[in-house]
């Protein structure tokens, strides 16, 4: 699974975008990046499966996970 991280403003303007192949590297980056800032960064993380589809969308305030939403495909 691939993890695409966006650091965003309150208006969801993108500050940085990074991709991680490993969930532990993603968490380590969030912890280190939050510790380095004088403000609490906001993150949006897309979890992408092997087929290239988005499975989950997560939001964080600093290191605190605010929400995790499962993305469901609707087929007519």
Question: Model regions: which residues?
Answer:
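Short aromatic-glycine-(Arg/Gly/Cys) micro-motifs in beta-strand/loop hairpins
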Residues: 1-14
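Short, mixed-charge low-complexity intrinsically disordered segments
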Residues: 15, 32-76
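Short amphipathic alpha-helices within nucleic acid-binding modules
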Residues: 26-29
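A short, exposed loop/beta-hairpin motif centered on an aromatic-Gly-Thr core
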Residues: 12-24
């Amino acid at each position: 699974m691939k993890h695409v991280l966006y650091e965003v403003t309150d208006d969801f303007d993108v500050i940085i975008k990074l991709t991680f192949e490993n969930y532990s590297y993603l968490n380590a980056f969030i912890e280190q990046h939050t510790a380095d800032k004088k403000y609490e960064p906001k993150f949006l993380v897309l979890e992408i499966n092997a087929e290239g589809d988005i499975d989950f969308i997560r939001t964080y305030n600093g290191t605190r996970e605010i929400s995790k939403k499962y993305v469901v495909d609707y087929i007519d």
